[in-house]
């Protein structure tokens, strides 16, 4: 079968809406509040699997899960002035309890730095309790005024993993930033999501942070999308909330903090990145169903029932070996209709079992990612499926990285950079002197967004595209979500 990616790349927005709807991942646009969608059972299971991977990586590195209230008092949210300025226009406010006006407005959590720091101030008193690493997976709310998009730009972000850590010194906090970056690399690698890692420029840091490091991927339409961020907060929040600890030398001082987050966009990326015109291709590491069995009816009812029995037996064999399998027993739909349904759900492997397989004691296997097919004996099926699931996982990761790298270009000419971005090409790297003035000018002239600069030192033997002074690094720019 020929694999095409025409709709996937050229009409990505329509493709994504179609996949979420027809694949029964997420119902968006019909719940009567803009920017809020409903996770359907199949999509919710995918979300759970992704959250499970995130939890495993955090739990295994000493993070402890907590759960904070949804509401934050206005006076508390305003304690860190730079922070509230960054979020003020996006906050949802609760102003009434029943018909009674509240004395203090309550914010629906846009993020939790001030709320968590408030409680850390009560819990943590000494360097002996540090480092301390908390995380929670919750809904956050942002009053988005731009066009909302399912899973990508929402007013309720339902899968917000935010980690918050406390350290005695700046250097300890920086080590935690480095650990967080490594954790995120492993998470995205397991999810088969490719990325570029950049430090955001000064004018685009998280409100209240000293440094912001961001993971961006490239979606099928060439737009870059932020999928994770890591922030070195320094002492900004601890000072604002008068949070002090006793240090090793006996003195009292403000601790240093970090925070880092991943959202619904991780799920959106998993669905989108490996797709084709048949739908998504879910990596086996998170697919809710790894193998679907499609019974092919025989010419008579008795043999058809035998085929169904054999199909169920094969599927049970996989489930007993921890390979999530489902037999499609719907007798109202044709095999072709079932192929369409399970392809748009992105199930990695399909088994087709008919009279021929029943008689020969074999199974017919088809991969979702490349539609290659194999016939193996029943007793060989477990090992073959395990082998293919590993191959699919690695092939998806490799091809996604190849695609991302092919969409990153270098240009030392601002007009050429603008033209490349106009063709929805992905990310352009331009030589940059390091000044905010030139960086903002690059954004203005290209009508694009600056993603930042590489965190590793990059030798650039070129001139800044704006001021023509010697470049210190490259600045990454892209059309973004």
Swiss-Prot record:
NCBIfam families: proS_fam_I (TIGR00408). It comes from the Archaea. Its main location: cytoplasm. PROSITE patterns: AA_TRNA_LIGASE_II. Keywords: Aminoacyl-tRNA synthetase, ATP-binding, Cytoplasm, Ligase, Nucleotide-binding, Protein biosynthesis. The keyword Lyase does not apply. It is found in: Cytoplasm. Homodimer. It is an enzyme of class 6 (ligase). GO terms for biological process: prolyl-tRNA aminoacylation. GO terms for cellular component: cytoplasm. Consists of three domains: the N-terminal catalytic domain, the anticodon-binding domain and the C-terminal extension. It catalyses: tRNA(Pro) + L-proline + ATP = L-prolyl-tRNA(Pro) + AMP + diphosphate. Belongs to the class-II aminoacyl-tRNA synthetase family. ProS type 3 subfamily. Its EC number is 6.1.1.15. This is Proline--tRNA ligase. Gene3D superfamilies: Anticodon-binding domain, Bira Bifunctional Protein, Domain 2, C-terminal domain of ProRS. Catalyzes the attachment of proline to tRNA(Pro) in a two-step reaction: proline is first activated by ATP to form Pro-AMP and then transferred to the acceptor end of tRNA(Pro). GO terms for molecular function: ATP binding; proline-tRNA ligase activity.
């Amino acid at each position: 079968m020929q694999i095409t990616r025409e709709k996937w790349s050229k009409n990505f927005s329509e493709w994504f809406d179609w996949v979420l709807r027809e694949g029964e991942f997420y119902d968006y646009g019909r719940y009567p509040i803009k920017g809020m969608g409903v996770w359907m059972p199949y999509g919710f299971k995918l979300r759970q699997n992704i959250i499970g991977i995130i939890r495993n990586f955090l739990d295994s590195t000493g993070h402890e899960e907590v759960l904070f209230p949804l509401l934050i008092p206005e006076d508390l949210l305003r304690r860190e002035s730079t922070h509230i300025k960054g979020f003020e226009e996006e906050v949802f406010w609760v102003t009434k309890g029943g018909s009674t006006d509240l004395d203090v407005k309550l914010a629906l959590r846009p993020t939790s730095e001030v709320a968590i720091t408030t409680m850390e101030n009560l819990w943590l008193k000494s360097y002996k309790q540090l480092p301390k690493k908390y995380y929670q997976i919750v809904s956050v709310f942002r009053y988005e005024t731009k066009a909302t998009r399912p899973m990508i730009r929402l007013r309720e972000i339902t899968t917000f993993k935010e980690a918050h850590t406390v350290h005695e010194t700046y250097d300890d906090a920086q080590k935690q930033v480095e650990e967080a970056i490594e954790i995120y690399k492993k998470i995205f690698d397991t999810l088969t999501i490719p990325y570029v890692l950049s430090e955001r420029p000064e004018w685009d840091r998280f409100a209240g942070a000293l440094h912001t490091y961001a993971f961006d991927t490239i979606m099928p339409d060439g737009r870059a999308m932020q999928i994770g961020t890591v922030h070195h907060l320094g002492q900004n929040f601890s000072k604002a909330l008068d949070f002090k600890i006793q240090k090793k030398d006996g003195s009292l001082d403000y601790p240093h903090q970090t925070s880092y987050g991943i959202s619904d966009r991780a799920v959106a990326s998993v669905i989108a990145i490996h797709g084709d015109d048949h739908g998504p291709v879910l990596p086996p590491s998170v697919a809710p169903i790894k193998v679907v069995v499609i019974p092919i009816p025989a010419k008579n009812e008795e043999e058809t029932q035998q085929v169904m029995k054999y199909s169920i037996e094969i599927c049970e064999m996989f489930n007993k070996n921890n390979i999530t399998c489902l037999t499609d027993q719907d007798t109202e739909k044709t095999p072709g209709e079932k192929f369409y349904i399970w392809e748009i759900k992105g199930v990695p492997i399909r088994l087709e079992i008919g009279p021929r397989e029943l008689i020969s004691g074999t199974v017919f296997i088809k991969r979702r990612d490349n539609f290659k097919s194999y016939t193996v004996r029943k007793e060989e099926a477990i090992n073959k499926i395990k082998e293919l699931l590993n191959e699919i996982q690695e092939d998806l990761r490799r091809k996604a990285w190849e695609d991302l790298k092919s969409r990153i270009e270098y240009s030392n000419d601002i007009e050429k950079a603008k033209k490349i971005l106009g063709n929805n090409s992905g990310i352009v790297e331009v030589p940059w002197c390091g000044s905010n003035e030139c960086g903002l000018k690059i954004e203005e002239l290209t009508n694009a967004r600056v993603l930042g600069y590489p965190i590793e030192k990059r030798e650039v033997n070129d001139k800044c595209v704006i001021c023509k002074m010697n470049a210190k690094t490259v600045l990454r720019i892209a059309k973004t979500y």
